[in-house]
Amino acid sequence: MDDAVGERLERLNSMLKRRGIILPAFEIHGGAAGLYDFGPLGGRLRNRVQQVWLDHWLSQGDITELSCPTITPYSVLEASGHVGEFSDFMTTCDACEEGFRADTLLEEYHSNPDSLSKEELAQELAKYSPPCPNCKESEWGDVSAQNLMFNTRIGSGKSGRDGFIRPETAQGMFTNFQSLYRHFRQRLPFGAVQVGKGYRNEISPRQGMIRLREFNMAELEYFIDPEVEIKHDFSPWKGKEIRLVPDNSEEVMMSIPAALESGIIRHATVAWYMARTADLLENLGIDLERLRFRQHEGTEMAHYASDCWDAEVHASYGWVECVGIAHRGCYDLSAHEQ
């Protein structure tokens, strides 16, 4: 990021604070990285965005809303794979002993450092020796995985259980599948949405509101029968080209129906939700010239996904992920059933 962009962001952050939109949390006690308050205007703006999101998806007709606890038993997130897999690779500066995400240190040297393995990250750090964001030295320790969930204890004494503060809202929707199935009279497809808080113990929160330790999430889970074809109506998007970045390929401008027909997008329901997401973002004021859908490389795919596309918006920090659309297959339901 050049100096001019940095100065503009400083002025923006100052304005957001001055006008009561975004405020550093617990500032009179020194604050805490990755925690922010929504002020009087910020809270109203957030609520309006959330309501637009809810109205957009609930209007589809086969989607309902849930609200699940943020405190989650250990067994739930063990079954989902989060206990073993929900982690980022970190390294520590030998000079100042601050920890950082290894991939973020390499963003200026590699086109997609999030796709690198632990060994590859270590090799790239040794090759480029990026400066420490804190002290500017270039002495890095070993790369290791750190789980991102906040631990807690549910209850006290002998009857207490280990648990976590949820890292995503999705698991409550999966564990309620049978109730949802009955609600929809035992007919697929159907979906559920949930708006609420998510919590991740980020290694190095940065970029203002982009990477936080407590944040607002809005998730939709849509359940289909893989043996029954759904006839999605793509006619509204046939002439509407959008920027796509397929796995290991060059960026292309193509309509979502054309990308589905050509096999770039592998599943019709994934394509449907990409198109509907583009409509939502445009309705919220995002310039489609600044929007792209990027497919995850195999090495960066979440443990539960067989395919994933991120909706990214080009901003002062570069391309910023704002929506993830993943084909989770039967992973979650099978995991909880076992």
Short names for language-model regions:
Residues 2-338:
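TRNA-recognition modules of translation machinery and tRNA-sensing kinases, especially anticodon-binding
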